[in-house]
Amino acid sequence: PSDLLTVPVTLSRGHLDLRVTQGADGNGTPSYAMAVKDDTRTAARASVLRSLPSVTLAVHPNAYYVRPQSLSDPGYDVLGAVGAGSYVLPQTQNSDIVWPGFSTEGVDYAGLPDGVDIGVRLLDGPAGAYAAFFQSGSLGGKPTVHFDSRDPSKSAIHTTSSTHMHGNWVFSA
């Protein structure tokens, strides 16, 4: 979209979404791109769309999480080994941590009967680094892992309708 802000910002708290945007090329054919919908109101007075390269998320020590024994079910291996630490941006909002979600609310699914697969990958990091995105199981159920950079079968987030979701974003320590 032409209304994307490109001035570099660092966001360290508040709500934002990785958002799929839909436009059209010169022939009217739909085109899609990713942007950050910044609702933090820390670098602007209102919600704004930002280009991905212009946004840095600051993850501070208060996001450090050690996997407890109570989450020893293998479904939670996305957090690393029991007793291991990682940085987690949680599924539920914590006002002291950046709270990223995922949104396809700007996509018209009428011409997409099979839905949309959004590929996700870890671009860079130290040796052995990983990133993941999962939603906690409800009522004691197993978590749903949407993305795990260590598992090629978990490299896309699939949606079949307009979606706004939050999950746990995990980054190795």
Spans of features found by a protein language model:
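Phosphate/adenylate-binding glycine loop and adjacent helical scaffold
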Residues: 1-152, 156, 160-163
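Hydrophobic/aromatic beta-strand elements that line small-molecule binding cavities or substrate pockets
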Residues: 169
